[in-house]
């Protein structure tokens, strides 16, 4: 992908979905921007004020909205198609362990770059990449897509704790070499069943010291829930291959306590009963609906999420547990999986929780069409609706890809 032009631009759109807290939709307005949004006004006024120095972009029949944020993916598994087994979390996990080295070797530059292009074509301007091996570092750093790069740490065998920590530090320090506003190193603690408490504590202390974002998988399966609650189930048989006498490192509550006052994305959480255990100021839930359907046969209880006032966001997860990294495919899947939701209301919520709400949590000054925000946005082909309340829904239903994508005000060439 290449970036085109640094010049100020005036973009005219038929409808502008601002994705602000009221889900305001503007009609027949212009957005003036360079790398940030300078003004939103009538097109004639924009041309009169800025026309001599600005490039005119005429999308008078189309829709403009903020670029999506996909905060949880695994690009290192981009080679998977039918290698991994779905339908049962433990079967899937065993197939991952058996195949991960082969799949990571097959995830060459071209495979990862292809999936990044798919993400961008579906309107994604920012990703949260969970990196287990570090083979994706330079690819993400040079991809043109904004990347929060979660260096992953795990390890349950007490004989290899120091080795696990040193390997993590080596990968993290390497990723720091690429740090800028488009590539942000961060930390992922894999999960409570795979990460010894001493490693989780070290990772959390490291994050506090260096002001880093964190991510973790949490209560993705019934197996994990039973393991943390009591410790005696099929999960123990699985864990015997990593430790002679495996025992739970945590209870669900004690695991969460390690992330106190740390901005953390807790991914999945489909077997969480009480969301009040999270801190709404520092914690958010990442929802991967397709992945949960394939592996856990359960989905997130959105009513419990809303009642707790905790932020939630939408992610595709990786091709290890999904058939597509196209973000619009994931949004459509949510409409079907959460079949008790009002379609139009839920569509608006999905768009907000994939843009402005996630940006606020991640500390990114974007995700909303408003003055001063970073100019990350997408153009969608126009269509007619008789009711404005249908716009969000029809954007999700009618589009496989965006027409154009701008990241930091620069046009992305697909």
Give, region by region, the residue ranges found by the protein language model:
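N-terminal metal-binding scaffold of metallo-dependent hydrolase/deaminase domains
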Residues: 1-50, 360, 364, 410
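Divalent metal-coordination and catalytic microenvironments
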Residues: 14, 31, 35, 61, ...
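Alpha-helical scaffold segments that flank or form the walls of functional sites
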Residues: 32, 63-64, 81-145, 166-180
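Active-site gating loops and adjacent loop-to-helix segments of metal-dependent hydrolytic enzymes
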Residues: 79-110, 148-154, 221-262, 334-344
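Active-site core of metal-dependent hydrolases
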Residues: 182-313, 320
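His/Asp/Glu-enriched, well-ordered alpha-helical/loop segment
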Residues: 300-383
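C-terminal cap of metal-dependent C-N hydrolases
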Residues: 374-414
